[in-house]
Each structure stands twice: as C-alpha cells, then as structure tokens.
Amino acid sequence: HQIVVESMWGMSFDKPVRHMREYLEVMMPLLEGKPVSHAGEAFNVNGGVNVPGGTRPNVVIAALGEQMLKVTAALADGTLTWCTGPQTLANHTVPTLKAAADKAGRDATRVIAALPVCVTNDREAALQRAAQVFVVYGQLPSYRAMLDKEGAAGPADIAIIGSASEVADRIMALAEIGVTDFAAVEFGATPDEVAETRALVKSLLK
C-alpha cells in the first residue's frame, strides 16, 4: 500500500511491480542457498546465506492485481489475497496466476484466500459489525480495486456470514474455484459468535 510504503517505511512506491520483481530475483536464490550478484534499480546485492540443512520455505506474495500476479507466478509460489470475493477469485485471481505460471513453466498456483467469517443467527447485526471492523480496507486502493471487481460496496459485502452450515458451504465452495488454502479472519458481534465461528473453522481443518 502506498500509504504504508511511503509514510511508514519512507520508501518509494513509484514502481511497485518492478520493485517486487527485483526483490524476488534477489531473495529467492538466497533462500535456496545460492550466492547472489545483483545490481539493479532498487537493490545492489553481493553475497549469500548458508543455513546448513535448511530448505527454502514457500514464498507467497500478497498479489492482487494482474501484473503483480504475473510476477508472483514467475518467481514465487503463490498469492495471499484479502478483500477479494469469490467471483473475483474465480474470474481474475486464479486464472491469471495459473496462466502466468503455465507460461513460466512453474507450479506457482497456491492461492490463500483470507476473508472475514462470522457464524451467527443475526445476519444484519453481523453485517453492521463487519462494516465497522473492516471499513478501513475499503479505503485502500489495492483492496478497493478487488471490491470493485466483485461489485461490492465494502468489505462487509464479501464477508462470509450465516449459520454454521451456510458458512461451511461457502468456505468449501472456494476450493472448487481453485483456492488452495483459506485463512479465516474471525469476527462477531458477541463473544458467543466469535466462539462458534472459531469452532466451525477448526472443524473444517484438514
């Protein structure tokens, strides 16, 4: 997010896709124990990291837009999304990542979808709670773009809210569109709702 990169980190947000590509070009070989000699626009690196017995961890990028998804497919292992609804995952995220991974000859198709989740008998109260808790995300351009693709006014519109069976069905349906992992961001208007939501999510763990 531009406001984070510039205002909090004091870095340039001028070319975020180029910056991420170069970052991964440096980091991925280092994680594999290979030496790196890199002179670029954002980084100048000469060196290596040696961790005896270590193996490279999976690297996932919070890639949402088309160009960042393509960089992710070419160099990393997958993406972690937020404020991205099921239609956008099905029609944008998953196919864009898969096509770019196929083109690069890589299996970088991991999609971790994070969404707000609440098991409740009072849908309207939960929607109001979601609108309050997650309002800031609808104001950040990257998330706003994903909400617009979904036709959602705000994060509450893509929250998974309902009875235990309804929530379970909606979470499981994500696997059918190519989501490989689900990250539940639990919330509730009451302590009981939070507890019921946690119990439901735990019951779905595989």
Residue map of PLM features:
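Active-site-adjacent structural elements that line small-molecule/cofactor binding pockets in enzymes
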Residues: 1-206
